[in-house]
Every structure is written in C-alpha cells, then in structure tokens.
C-alpha cells in the first residue's frame, strides 16, 4: 500500500527497494491470493512512491522443499504463462518511464510524523486508552490527506521539516 511505502521511504528519505515481492500463492496459503494484473499495478504504484527496484521471489517455483508451495513468476516446469508475460510487460513499461523521467521521488508538501518513541510508548507503555493504536492513528491522518488528493510523506520526528507546508503530528510523548 502507499502508506507502507511511505513509512519505509520516509525512514530513509531516499528511494527504496522491494525485495521478494509476491506473485501468487505463498507457503502460508494455497489459495491464489494475487489476482492477474495486481503485480503490474503494484509495480507502477511502487515506482510512483519512490521504489527503484522490485524483485519477485521465487522467480521460478521449486520442485521440493518448503518453497515448492510458493508460486513463482514461472512454475517449476519452465513454461512461460500469464505471470511471466505480465512481469515482462511491466518491466518494459517501467523501462520506458525511467527513460523519460529518470529516477522519481514523490514531492509532498504535507508530512505526517511517525515517531518511534511515541509508537513504543503507546504500544508497550501505559496508556490512558488501551484501544488506542498509534500506527492506526498515524494512518488515519495520512488517509485523510490522501483522500483529498494531498500527497503526504510519513516521516520521522527527526527529519528535516523545512520542505513541508503542512506537518501533522498525531501524538507526542513527553
């Protein structure tokens, strides 16, 4: 999701990589939980949120061992099927975008602060409201901005705030 991408990128303030992206069934479930078209959609979304590299694991399904339960871009019989062609099409599209634009990082004028100390305090320490989940509250503010088409970064309280016109601080721990 865009929120997860922003949390990861916001902690680094630079482009990110997505290792071991999911293409189909996983070892945890045998259902085909990734519908056709979703890996392409996710890769385009990753690019829009500052991802520089995304890899799928496994590329080819295994014949044995725990990984034989996981779908790959290609199944263990090496026959190219729809997943392979979808990844191939996506790679071509992303290459064309990179050729025209170069590396892209989103430019946001709004930021939502995610403070790890506050996160720890509310999740592990004493709180006045046991149902209060700090990360859920951060998401609510982020989602409110995005639902109004306002691009927002999720950044640390230690980050440089000078480039932002709006800064949302969900909670502070003193």
Residue ranges and their predicted role:
Residues 1-174:
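Carbohydrate-binding surfaces of carbohydrate-active enzymes
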């Amino acid at each position: 999701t865009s929120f997860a991408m922003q949390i990861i990128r916001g902690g680094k303030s630079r482009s990110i990589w997505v290792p071991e992206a999911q293409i189909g069934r996983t070892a945890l479930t045998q259902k085909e939980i990734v519908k056709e078209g979703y890996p392409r959609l996710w890769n385009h979304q990753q690019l829009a949120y500052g991802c520089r590299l995304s890899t799928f694991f496994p590329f080819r399904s295994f014949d044995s061992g725990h990984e034989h339960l996981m779908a790959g871009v290609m199944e263990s019989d090496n026959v190219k099927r729809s997943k392979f062609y979808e990844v191939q099409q996506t790679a071509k599209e992303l290459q064309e975008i990179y050729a025209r634009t170069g590396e892209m990082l989103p430019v946001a004028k709004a930021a939502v602060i995610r403070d790890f100390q506050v996160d720890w305090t509310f999740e592990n320490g004493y709180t006045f409201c046991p149902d209060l989940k700090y990360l859920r509250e951060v998401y609510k503010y982020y989602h409110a901005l995005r639902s109004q088409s306002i691009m927002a970064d999720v950044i640390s309280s230690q980050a440089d705030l000078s480039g932002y016109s709006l800064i949302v601080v969900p909670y502070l721990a003193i």
